[in-house]
Amino acid sequence: MLQTLHDYFWWERLWLPVNLTWADLEDRDGRVYAKASDLYITLPLALLFLIIRYFFELYVATPLAALLNVKEKTRLRAPPNPTLEHFYMTSGKQPKQADVELLSRQSGLSGRQVERWFRRRRNQDRPSLLKKFREASWRFTFYLIAFIAGTAVIVDKPWFYDLRKVWEGYPIQSIIPSQYWYYMIELSFYWSLLFSIASDVKRKDFKEQIIHHVATIILISFSWFANYVRAGTLIMALHDSSDYLLESAKMFNYAGWKNTCNNIFIVFAIVFIITRLVILPFWILHCTLVYPLELYPAFFGYYFFNFMMGVLQLLHIFWAYLILRMAHKFITGKVVEDERSDREETESSEGEEAAAGGGAKNRPLANGHPILNNNHRKND
């Protein structure tokens, strides 16, 4: 049965145009073609990425955070309380008013004390500012290097300037070492993101992030073994062109450099809109939807690839909506911050705020820093 499933999955009619077989993509005459077995290396490489990330965050990102004066807000810990802890772990982190009244009677605390305990307990579970900074630093470093390397891989190729050449001779298109390593490294990195997503900072778009990582892994993998490599390199470079800007904006936001953060964010928003909502759908998707049909009849692989591209495009539209919301806040005089962030709650008691080192007393906090409006910002 397993052999039958294997044979059906790798049936040429699913993944290749009519009258072509996998034998046509076997290495010959010094020409090397993409093969599914090439992708096996990406799993150990993903584990290597996790190891490199650990040491990068420890020996590069942490000193950089200190250099940029990334400071933690002192958090008041919730005192031990078995009754409230049991409710927090089993019933929810946001008790309703009726729950607060019941817990007040069970614990012998006032309703206000119960609410304060849950605020502190939720804050304990939120990631620290240093953790956020280190994570953003790692992603910034990778995306910047990947964008530079990816651009170097494609900038001298004829299909970079004429998209019809993406399909010239398809699928009998040999690959070169730079394409191989670009693919393996990108795919390995996204595997590492998927492996670490449970321990990384969780944002409001957590489910969308999982969908994005899975869709990206499927797209990169399929485009490799079906030899959509030329289109794949264009798509990966296009995606990397804006991601490093977002991560750098986050880094400066966590460091409290609001002017720098806002300026980089505006650049990111422009690049994101142009690349994800203009170039990708009207050039790249047009290239993958229209041009192949001029060469051969549509087949399953054609539909599958473009369906997954459609999934990514829907995510781009969703994220563009969040970006435009943040841009609107910036234009209307509110500090830009990541709409996906899980914001830390503040204590309502003045005495507690003072005990926490209330230099930011009576001022709202975002990411552990007092929010600075456009009329009073930290100088860059």
UniProtKB/Swiss-Prot annotation:
Region (Homeobox-like): 67-128
Gene Ontology annotations for the cellular component aspect, listed alphabetically: endoplasmic reticulum; endoplasmic reticulum membrane
Motif extent (Last loop motif): 291-300
Activity control mechanisms: Ceramide synthase activity is inhibited by sphingosine-1-phosphate.
Record-listed E.C. numbers: 2.3.1.24, 2.3.1.297
Catalytic function, reaction form: a very long-chain fatty acyl-CoA + a sphingoid base = an N-(very-long-chain fatty acyl)-sphingoid base + CoA + H(+); docosanoyl-CoA + sphinganine = N-docosanoylsphinganine + CoA + H(+); tetracosanoyl-CoA + sphinganine = N-tetracosanoylsphinganine + CoA + H(+); hexacosanoyl-CoA + sphinganine = N-hexacosanoylsphinganine + CoA + H(+)
Modified residues (Phosphothreonine): T346
One GO-annotated biological process of the protein: ceramide biosynthetic process
Chain ranges on the Cytoplasmic side, renumbered to this chain: 325-380
Membrane-spanning intervals of the chain: 41-61, 140-160, 181-201, 209-229, 264-284, 304-324
Residues with Phosphoserine modification: S341, S348, S349
Disordered as annotated region, ranges: 338-380
Topology feature Lumenal, residues: 1-40
Function recorded in the entry: Ceramide synthase that catalyzes the transfer of the acyl chain from acyl-CoA to a sphingoid base, with high selectivity toward very-long-chain fatty acyl-CoA (chain length C22-C27). N-acylates sphinganine and sphingosine bases to form dihydroceramides and ceramides in de novo synthesis and salvage pathways, respectively. Plays a non-redundant role in the synthesis of ceramides with very-long-chain fatty acids in kidney, liver and brain. Regulates the abundance of myelin-specific sphingolipids galactosylceramide and sulfatide that affects myelin sheath architecture and motor neuron functions.
PANTHER family according to UniProt: CERAMIDE SYNTHASE 2, LONGEVITY ASSURANCE FACTOR 1 LAG1
Domain writeup: The last loop motif confers selectivity toward behenoyl-CoA (docosanoyl-CoA; C22:0-CoA) and lignoceroyl-CoA (tetracosanoyl-CoA; C24:0-CoA) as acyl donors.
Protein name: Ceramide synthase 2
Originating organism: Bos taurus
Name of the encoding gene: CERS2
